[in-house]
Amino acid sequence: MPGIRVKEGESIESALKRFKKATEKAGILSEIRKREHYEKPSVKRKKKALAAKKRAVKKARKSF
């Protein structure tokens, strides 16, 4: 988990902003949302295949 040290004279708002940026960069919030509910392995496979298909279509469209 990312941690920050509050600098001397730094406001709480700016420290909170740095912390939010660090957690977003580490992908913690997206990981929490992903693990919030159980997802069956078959559903995971379908989502993964759909994402791969979208990437392929996007790549093919970009090459033209």
Swiss-Prot record:
UniProt feature, compositional bias: Basic residues: 43-64
Residue ranges, annotated region (Disordered): 39-64
Gene Ontology terms for molecular function: structural constituent of ribosome
Cellular component, GO, one term: ribosome
Protein's GO biological process: translation
Keyword Transmembrane helix listed: no
Keywords per UniProt: Ribonucleoprotein, Ribosomal protein
Pfam families: Ribosomal_S21
PANTHER family given in the database record: MITOCHONDRIAL 28S RIBOSOMAL PROTEIN S21, SMALL RIBOSOMAL SUBUNIT PROTEIN BS21
Family: Belongs to the bacterial ribosomal protein bS21 family.
Protein's name in the database: Small ribosomal subunit protein bS21
